[in-house]
Amino acid sequence: MDHVYKGQLQAYALQHNLELPVYANEREGPPHAPRFRCNVTFCGQTFQSSEFFPTLKSAEHAAAKIAVASLTPQSPEGIDVAYKNLLQEIAQKESSLLPFYATATSGPSHAPTFTSTVEFAGKVFSGEEAKTKKLAEMSAAKVAFMSIKNGNSNQTGSPTLPSERQEDVNSNVKSSPQEIHSQPSSKVVMTPDTPSKGIKVNEDEFPDLHDAPASNAKEINVALNEPENPTNDGTLSALTTDGMKMNIASSSLPIPHNPTNVITLNAPAANGIKRNIAACSSWMPQNPTNDGSETSSCVVDESEKKKLIMGTGHLSIPTGQHVVCRPWNPEITLPQDAEMLFRDDKFIAYRLVKP
């Protein structure tokens, strides 16, 4: 704590209306490792440090310490006034509140006695009794400064705050998987007239939509972090680049659970995401009916079947090819390099080859 002596020396000069101390330094050593020694001129006297220091600031404080030691026998009370300035400097460096002094008076009016307290760094320090208010505040400031010097109140904040925040973060991380699983899944119903937009609804608000069979409408079910749909559900499933899974119902009739009748296209995406696309196969009936009035078909031309079927029914899509499925609209214009895979009155699927 040798750096306090420069402040004490300056406070003494201000109290007694003296000239401020003047510092001069000398330097030695190489440029990459200089050493400094300072002398200070105060009250007509020059005080010099006896050794060299690695920094100029340390050398100035050493010289000020010698000057303060020479003034202590003459006016010890004048040295004590520096403690108020030191508390203020500490508050400014730490960006904390300035010290707040409160003084109480006791005794007769012709000979009062003053006792001061100072609130600093979140604590209250009491000084000794003095004959004047100024000396009482000096005493309280000295007690506060010595307490900080001894390390009793270096920290003004709660030391347990970082650990409490860490515990909160850990609890949030542990509870996040349960929260994700507890969230209800959502459905996005896309209509042909708005191919680029969808309406997001919760299943809890519309239970009929959740319980409705696949024959009423062809839906796009969007869910996060769900296990992959097995290939025996007769659906067209694909993982998009942002991790969302799209299950597109491809038939309006219940489909028998026969995994050998489903054609799956496995394509590694550019980011390593596996795309599983299950399409209609040759076993599906043509123009099945639900109630005898409306018909819905899943028609695949023979040429398209040859393109989809290979060996055991699995075809690998080379890197750079993308399968796009969107609502069908007669006004849709396919890209020049598009290869149509499937189309009915609701949806159309085609393949793109991108360089």
Curated annotation (Swiss-Prot):
Residues 149-193 are annotated as: Disordered. Disruption phenotype: Elongated and downwardly curled rosette leaves. In old plants, rosette and cauline leaves and flowers change to red color. Increased levels of ARF3 and ARF4 transcripts, targeted by TAS1 and TAS3, respectively. It holds the Pfam family dsrm. GO terms for biological process: defense response to virus; miRNA processing; RNAi-mediated antiviral immune response; ta-siRNA processing. It comes from Arabidopsis thaliana (Mouse-ear cress). Double-stranded RNA-binding protein involved in RNA-mediated post-transcriptional gene silencing (PTGS). Functions in the trans-acting small interfering RNAs (ta-siRNAs) biogenesis by binding and assisting DICER-LIKE 4 (DCL4). Required for DCL4 activity. Required for the 21 nucleotide ta-siRNAs production of the TAS3 transcript in leaves but not in flowers. Plays an important role in silencing RNA of both DNA and RNA viruses. Involved with argonaute 7 (AGO7) and RDR6 in turnip crinkle virus (TCV) silencing. May not be directly involved in viral siRNA production. Keywords: Host-virus interaction, Nucleus, Plant defense, Repeat, RNA-binding, RNA-mediated gene silencing. Residues 4-73, 82-150 form the DRBM domain. It is found in: Nucleus. GO terms for molecular function: double-stranded RNA binding. InterPro entries: AtDRB-like_DSRM_1, AtDRB-like_DSRM_2, dsRBD_dom. It comes from the Eukaryota. PANTHER family: DOUBLE-STRANDED RNA-BINDING PROTEIN 4, PTHR46031. This is Double-stranded RNA-binding protein 4. Expressed in roots, leaf vasculature, shoot apical meristem (SAM) and developing anthers. Heterodimer with DRB1 or DRB5. Interacts with DCL4 and cauliflower mosaic virus (CaMV) transactivator/viroplasmin protein. Interaction with CaMV transactivator/viroplasmin protein inhibits RNA silencing ability of DRB4. GO terms for cellular component: nucleus. Residues 149-188 have a biased composition (Polar residues).
